[in-house]
Amino acid sequence: MTIRNFNYHMTHFVISAPDIRHLPRDEGIEVAFAGRSNAGKSSALNTLTGQKSLARTSKTPGRTQLINLFEVVEGVRLVDLPGYGYAEVPEEMKLKWQRALGEYLQKRNCLKGLVVLMDIRHPLKDLDQQMITWAVAVGTPVMLLLTKADKLASGARKAQLNMVREAIIPFMGDIQVEAFSSLKKIGVDKLREKLDTWFSEIPPEVMIDEYDDEEGK
């Protein structure tokens, strides 16, 4: 397989949806970003794409209640899933979000990979582990980003990284763990490389359509 280098700076917003029934057709390739409400998910997407406001960051955790789709090129999408685990959100709404997350991860056929973001100081909370379990159960590879890595000194950062790598072994899945910081750009290259690898497995018919469109210009 040839690894393509995608230009994530060209990423643009497509649609917001409350559940998978309101998403575009289940085709092409999607990589989803998931994490607790204060894990830095929106900041990571903005850093990856070089766009300060592509994914809205909020001072109030839990504001992202919809599935947000962004297109890199035709047939290649990044998906910002609702943040989870915020204590002040009503229980009924929490359950609704969790159902939407589980349904997306288990039923969306074009989902190629899952990026789970966790604060490096508080990794692998119950809901983080649930996301990993759902992904592994359907054979979806996972990248765990330990965010806010700049908050720890180098030694403590490496210790947390090694601890999480050991802790995820029992999940028996295709899981890569990296330290990440939107502020200091730590781990951004590794995220980009992983996305390029996943997206390079895009179905041939989509690649042909894209090539034909460019030839016709």
Swiss-Prot record:
Residues 27-201 form the EngB-type G domain. One of its GO terms (molecular function) is metal ion binding. It comes from the Bacteria. The keyword GTP-binding applies. Mg(2+) binds at S42, T64. Keywords: Cell cycle, Cell division, GTP-binding, Magnesium, Metal-binding, Nucleotide-binding, Septation. GTP binds at residues 35-42, 62-66, 80-83, 147-150, 180-182. One of its GO terms (cellular component) is cytosol. Its cofactor is Mg(2+). Transmembrane segments: none annotated. It holds the Pfam family MMR_HSR1. GO terms for biological process: division septum assembly. Belongs to the TRAFAC class TrmE-Era-EngA-EngB-Septin-like GTPase superfamily. EngB GTPase family. Necessary for normal cell division and for the maintenance of normal septation. NCBIfam families: GTPase_YsxC. This is Probable GTP-binding protein EngB. The lineage of its organism: Bacteria, Pseudomonadati, Pseudomonadota, Gammaproteobacteria, Enterobacterales.
